[in-house]
Amino acid sequence: MANTVILVDQPTLEKMKQTYLPFSNPKLPPGAVFAAKKPGVSITGYKSRKVMFQGVNGEAEAKKWVATLPESKAKAPSVSKGILPANFASKNVIGSDEVGTGDFFGPITVCAAYVDAEMMPLLKELGVKDSKAMKDPEICRIAEKIMPLVPHSVLLCPNPKYNELQKRGMNQGQMKALLHNRAIENVLKKLAPIKPEAILIDQFAEKNTYYRYLAKEPSIIREDVFFATKAEGLHLSVAAASIIARYKFVQAFDAMSKEVGIPLPKGAGPHVDAVAAEIIERFGLETLAKYTKQHFANTEKALKMVKK
């Protein structure tokens, strides 16, 4: 399970120690000044002023402190997995997220978006939040309102290009890294000379792996980059990026459905196999490849359905 680590100042570390005293664990790991366990989360504070949250409720617990901590006088490491500076939620940040990676039909879609502190109240009023529970109509309604307000860049990897790259040996993580890096670079160019205080990527790979994927890129964004899972809940920029990415993904999906003349389903379950088999029967395997990620198991399952 992923860990969330935040960097705090000394007074806050002492405050956390007192707050978690009723849940304290007497067994301290090396370098720790306190340890506690609550339902769904273990918390460990270290002499280095780093505090680690582990467990299913770890990120939610950490977020309480990230959102309320005073600004730390010490500068946090600019590129560190899982370490977010104090008061991160109110900083001016470029956030990036992607959709479509687990869908048999449709492109991978990545969006990077910049949100500053002044824009946050309006975005919240317009409904920007963690979008996982939102239905497509709500996503589209909010996206159309915020896109003129938020500097952003959306990049799609269409299915034919995806299949070409995959056959050349590129995995999905590499594709996502390239798209995130370029989308972030695009937003930085739009903002110049303004610079964000940080860049937050919704984490899909370890930091070292992410940068290894980008090794051959002529321009690699490294300064003030942070990685976190469930980053939509850590900064509005990622929530906005997720909403815009999903909006563009839905648009692409609708266009493909109209083009092929069949409503295309999302996901990669059995319901997807049946539609894929119908496309093979009516138009052939080459047509299916135009709209799908060919290496998914759905391709073989659909072929077996056709042969029965």
UniProtKB/Swiss-Prot annotation:
Broad class of where this protein is predominantly found: cytoplasm
RNase H type-2 domain boundaries: 91-308
Pfam families according to UniProt: DUF3378, RNase_HII
UniProt KW Lyase keyword: no
Localization per Swiss-Prot or TrEMBL: Cytoplasm
EC number(s) per entry: 3.1.26.4
Cofactor(s), names only, from the UniProt record: Mn(2+); Mg(2+)
Amino-acid positions noted as binding a divalent metal cation in the UniProt annotation, renumbered to this chain: 97-98, 202
PANTHER family found in the cross-reference section: RIBONUCLEASE, RIBONUCLEASE H2 SUBUNIT A
Described purpose of this protein according to its UniProt entry: Endonuclease that specifically degrades the RNA of RNA-DNA hybrids.
Protein name stated in the entry: Ribonuclease HIII
Organism: Listeria monocytogenes serovar 1/2a (strain ATCC BAA-679 / EGD-e)
